[in-house]
Amino acid sequence: LLENPIKQAIAFAVINRSMTRKITMGHFGHTQALVYASDPERIKRNRSLVRPIKEIFEEILPKYNNAVFDNKQDNQSFHKNILELLPTVENVDLAYFDPPYCDSHADYQGFYHLLETYTEYWKDKEFVNGIKRYEPQRVSGFDKKRDVLNSFEKLFEFSEEIPHWLISYNNRSYPGIEEFEKLISKYRDVKVEAKTYHNGRGGKGSVAGSQEILFVCKPKKKHFVSTNQQQELVNEGF
């Protein structure tokens, strides 16, 4: 119905947000979701549980439309593996990385694939054993202990030309905070900020008492000169 790809993207964003408003346990993979959604006490706290998705969509659509503005810049958006993307981009000042919380027991595909599956209209999806598993399984390289250290090494090597990094993390993740800080320190000066969850919000990563971590990374104290800047200096005779 919508031929404009930008309007299509906004519509998908709104319908996905409408669906997440009906989540009961922090994700879509909980087998007791319908039971919890029928609990009168839960309904009191979240009326969206019993509201039609269309009604929620119509309520929040104006907010999304009002958020659209022209920043007078040429903007780009990418949807691909970060290790494939980084070698292709340049002139980036700041990178924010939000990797999966390895070893937190969060099955991101099982918990949240519904949104992508809906948006892609079941493209290339094959469900196996009823609703228990689906194919193809996608592996990021950051969610298995055997792969994650090597993947982070590649991530940081490919990000050498980006001066500043922000990295979201969780103190329940692998590698641990000290080991991860040591790994980052090979490439950047790093400061660690922590925020403790006092209440659980669903999912293993946000249980009460766990900490959300932010690694604030900046160039080492010696003056940072990117490869592009080095070439400019050479061209100018320095």
Regions found by a protein language model. Give the residues of each.
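SAM-dependent nucleic-acid methyltransferase catalytic core
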Residues: 1-110, 123-137
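Short, glycine-/Ser/Thr-/acidic-enriched flexible segments
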Residues: 102, 138-140, 172, 220-222
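Class I S-adenosyl-L-methionine
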Residues: 177-181, 187-231, 236-238
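Generic recognition of flexible, low-complexity loop/linker segments
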Residues: 82-85, 153-156, 201-203
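Glycine-rich, phosphate-binding/catalytic loops in enzymes
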Residues: 107-115, 183-185
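Glycine-rich S-adenosyl-L-methionine
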Residues: 115-157
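Structural motif
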Residues: 96-98, 166, 216
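Conserved Class I SAM-dependent methyltransferase catalytic core
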Residues: 139-188
